[in-house]
């Protein structure tokens, strides 16, 4: 097999590996202040316990804010001081899913939330 064919095969394999990694979040929800909420982030295509999962927030018209992260292998968490005590980050490694949870929402929690590996 020529070097060009080997390179093309290697690139095809690498593209396939990268394309399999996914984080799929639960859908949008409409909630009232004072209600609870849990959003999920399901990982696939990689070893879920080998990577931290971070959560970030984007308020309307604003930039991204890092909220915190979890190590799914042992559920160790770090929080931004701005979010400590207001949200809870957890994970269930048996189903490769991380969660972001509020026990009592505020109107100021209106935003887009994203998980990231």
UniProtKB/Swiss-Prot annotation:
Coiled coil: none
Domain spans labelled Ig-like: 20-117
Keyword flag Membrane: yes
Region (Complementarity-determining-1): 45-52
Residue span of region Framework-2: 53-69
Framework-1: region residues: 20-44
Signal peptide segment: 1-19
InterPro entries found in the cross-reference section: Ig-like_dom, Ig-like_dom_sf, Ig-like_fold, Ig_V-set, IgHV
Region (Framework-3): 78-115
Region (Complementarity-determining-3): 116-117
UniProt GO BP: immunoglobulin mediated immune response
Keyword check for Signal: yes
Entry keyword set: Adaptive immunity, Cell membrane, Disulfide bond, Immunity, Immunoglobulin, Immunoglobulin domain, Membrane, Secreted, Signal
Region (Complementarity-determining-2): 70-77
Main location: secreted
Disulfide links within the chain: 41-115
UniProt-annotated location(s): Secreted; Cell membrane
GO CC annotation, single: immunoglobulin complex
GO MF term list: antigen binding
Family matches, as Pfam families: V-set
Function: V region of the variable domain of immunoglobulin heavy chains that participates in the antigen recognition. Immunoglobulins, also known as antibodies, are membrane-bound or secreted glycoproteins produced by B lymphocytes. In the recognition phase of humoral immunity, the membrane-bound immunoglobulins serve as receptors which, upon binding of a specific antigen, trigger the clonal expansion and differentiation of B lymphocytes into immunoglobulins-secreting plasma cells.
Quaternary context: Immunoglobulins are composed of two identical heavy chains and two identical light chains; disulfide-linked.
Protein name: Immunoglobulin heavy variable 5-10-1
Source species of the chain: Homo sapiens
Lineage: Eukaryota, Metazoa, Chordata, Craniata, Vertebrata
């Amino acid at each position: 097999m020529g070097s060009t064919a080997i390179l093309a095969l290697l690139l095809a394999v690498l593209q396939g590996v990268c394309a399999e990694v996914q984080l799929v979040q639960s859908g949008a929800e409409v909630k009232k202040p004072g209600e609870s909420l849990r959003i999920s982030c399901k990982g696939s295509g990689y070893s879920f316990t080998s990577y931290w999962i971070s959560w970030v927030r984007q308020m309307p018209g604003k930039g991204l804010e890092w909220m915190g992260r979890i190590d799914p292998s042992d559920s160790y968490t770090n929080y931004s001081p701005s979010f400590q005590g207001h949200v809870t980050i957890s994970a269930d490694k048996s189903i490769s899913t991380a969660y972001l949870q509020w026990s009592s929402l505020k109107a100021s929690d209106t935003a887009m939330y994203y998980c990231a590996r």
